[in-house]
């Protein structure tokens, strides 16, 4: 008996639907018919999208799509980090950093560069020892990453001849990425695109989906169904009746107001990073692209009404709220109890969502697709495959949820009800353990210093996504320091001397690259052929 899956039906287009179609088309080597049912009248969510570095290696390279090709088609720009602004000082939202008591500006970066090490101890721990002993007042991201100097100068992460200088991710227009991948999947992989609206889910006596009925009367039969219908979860939550686990007891923000803001690139340059600007009831993203930046104020409607949030957002950028077209979104925070139920797999917003504080949304999509391809079933839908897939998605999501909550919980801000309420939320045991590990001076998660092992291996990165460097960037950036230096360093004078050479090398590399790299604006103009 032939138990192979013959047809996969994907409900929903957008970024999640077309990434899924394109990836499965490649992974299944054209042995399975793939159909995307996309309602043309459903508006797409998103004003600017930010990503993480493995997007090219884990997704576009796998599809054989060169970086420059999709970047040109999707108005993409470069992202070297998230820059956090005013997460420690009280006050209303402002793109201009305030000043801390120690004289530093209230900013810190979470870059993608990997930490060097001396005697198998990451440079973060030598920096912490120096800082705690009063031997330096340099911030962690400045001392340990050459990328910070590059970003401060608004330089690009690549040379004009396109040689790579450092690690980076991307900003892009999500609707253009969806359109690009739709064209790729339909023309290169023979994916069938059905523009119609689903009206009914047909199931058998076991509760398995057998087909989707459309508004025009078509019956789309399939063996495996992928729900990319967004927050509505039309298959996983409605048809499969799988409960969505609300996690607003960990993360308070549940709404956003967004728009695109014109920008004079020639006068002001283009920033090669995403900005995260703390507000009185949440935070605002800024995603630079040529000629404009996408921006959105993420907030909790328990602490600000839609009108109040819109006014605060408008004031931040000097917008006229009466003459600006805003995109208002209310989102659910959390995940499905199970991402895969019977023969229905949820991907993207239909599966899980956390606010885009660390740009995890697109990553969640292709991580889920990667895991689906790895656990791809036959018609018996082996319980072990399904359960292991669900465990992978659950652990991926919960780890990111905890990492994001730490941003709020350990911020010293208590100037508004929103910031005070974040201190009253319960932390998961896993993040408590990481904080105690950090406070004791030990590395958090596996320290990663080998880019080939980390960025070149999706499985390794998936299981250690938020690295020791990530936790150091956030904890130290928010002013949370280890109680004491790593005790073992007291016995390693030669290693400390080696670390000093590494600190000097970081500064030297940063200075050299600032002098030799083009501005982000100039490189993007070259890439996009702008006159």
Swiss-Prot record:
Residues bound to chloride: 360-361
Entry annotated with the keyword Nucleotide-binding: yes
Binding site for FAD: 13, 15-16, 39, 42, 45, 47, 50, 198, 349, 362
Nucleotide-binding as UniProt keyword: yes
UniProt GO molecular function: monooxygenase activity; nucleotide binding
Function: Involved in the biosynthesis of thienodolin, a plant growth-regulating compound. Catalyzes the chlorination of tryptophan (Trp) at C6 position to yield 6-chloro-tryptophan. It is also able to use bromide ions to generate monobrominated Trp. In vitro, accepts a wide range of amides and peptides carrying either L- or D-Trp at the N-terminus.
Domain notes from UniProt: Binding of tryptophan induces structural changes. Binding of substrate to the halogenase reduces the affinity for the oxidized cofactor FAD presumably to facilitate the regeneration of FADH(2) by flavin reductases.
Record family assignment: Belongs to the flavin-dependent halogenase family. Bacterial tryptophan halogenase subfamily.
Protein name, per record: Tryptophan 6-halogenase ThaL
Organism whose genome encodes this protein: Streptomyces albogriseolus
């Amino acid at each position: 008996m032939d138990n192979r899956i013959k047809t996969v039906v994907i409900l929903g287009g957008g970024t999640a639907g077309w990434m899924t179609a394109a990836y499965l088309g490649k992974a299944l080597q054209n042995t399975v018919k793939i159909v995307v049912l996309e309602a043309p009248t459903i508006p797409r969510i998103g004003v600017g999208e930010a990503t993480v570095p493995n997007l090219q290696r884990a997704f576009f390279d796998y599809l054989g799509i060169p970086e420059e090709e999709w970047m040109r088609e999707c108005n993409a720009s470069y992202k070297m980090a998230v820059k956090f602004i005013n997460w420690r000082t009280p006050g209303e939202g402002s793109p201009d950093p305030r000043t801390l008591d120690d004289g530093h500006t209230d900013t810190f970066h979470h870059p993608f560069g990997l930490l060097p090490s001396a005697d198998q101890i990451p440079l973060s721990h030598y920096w912490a020892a120096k800082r705690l002993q009063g031997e330096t007042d340099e911030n962690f991201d400045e001392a340990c990453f050459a990328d910070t100097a590059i970003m401060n100068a608004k330089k690009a992460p690549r040379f004009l001849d396109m040689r790579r200088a450092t690690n980076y991710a991307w900003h892009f227009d999500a609707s253009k990425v969806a359109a690009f991948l739709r064209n790729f999947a339909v023309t290169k992989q023979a994916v069938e695109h059905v523009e119609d609206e689903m009206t009914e889910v047909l199931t058998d006596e076991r509760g398995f989906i057998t087909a989707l009925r459309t508004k025009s009367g078509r019956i789309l039969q399939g063996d495996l169904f992928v729900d990319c219908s967004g927050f509505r979860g039309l298959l996983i939550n409605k048809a499969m009746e799988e409960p969505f686990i609300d996690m607003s007891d960990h993360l308070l923000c549940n709404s956003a107001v967004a728009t695109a803001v014109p920008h004079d690139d020639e006068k002001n340059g283009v920033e090669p990073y995403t900005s995260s600007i703390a507000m009185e009831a949440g935070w605002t993203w800024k995603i630079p692209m040529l000629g404009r930046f996408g921006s959105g104020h993420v907030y909790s409607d328990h602490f600000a009404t839609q009108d109040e949030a819109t006014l605060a957002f408008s004031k931040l950028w000097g917008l006229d709220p009466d003459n600006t077209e805003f995109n208002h979104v209310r989102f659910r925070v959390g995940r499905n109890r199970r991402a895969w139920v019977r023969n229905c797999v949820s991907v993207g917003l239909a599966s899980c969502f956390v606010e885009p504080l660390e740009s995890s949304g697109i990553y969640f999509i292709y991580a889920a697709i990667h895991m689906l391809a790895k656990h791809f079933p036959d018609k018996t839908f082996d319980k072990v495959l399904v359960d292991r897939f669900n465990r992978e998605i659950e652990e991926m999501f919960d780890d990111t949820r905890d990492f994001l909550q730490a941003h709020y919980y350990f911020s010293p801000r208590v100037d508004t009800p929103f910031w005070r309420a974040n201190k009253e939320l319960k932390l998961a045991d896993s993040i408590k353990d990481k904080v105690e590990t950090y406070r004791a001076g030990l590395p958090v998660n596996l320290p990663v210093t080998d880019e080939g092992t980390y960025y070149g291996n999706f499985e390794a990165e998936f299981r250690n996504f938020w690295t020791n460097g990530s936790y150091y960037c956030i904890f130290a950036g928010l002013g949370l320091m280890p109680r004491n230096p790593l005790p073992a360093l007291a016995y390693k004078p030669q290693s400390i001397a080696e670390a000093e050479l590494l600190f000097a090398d970081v500064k030297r590399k940063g200075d050299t690259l600032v002098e030799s790299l083009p501005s982000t604006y100039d490189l993007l103009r070259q890439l996009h052929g702008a006159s």
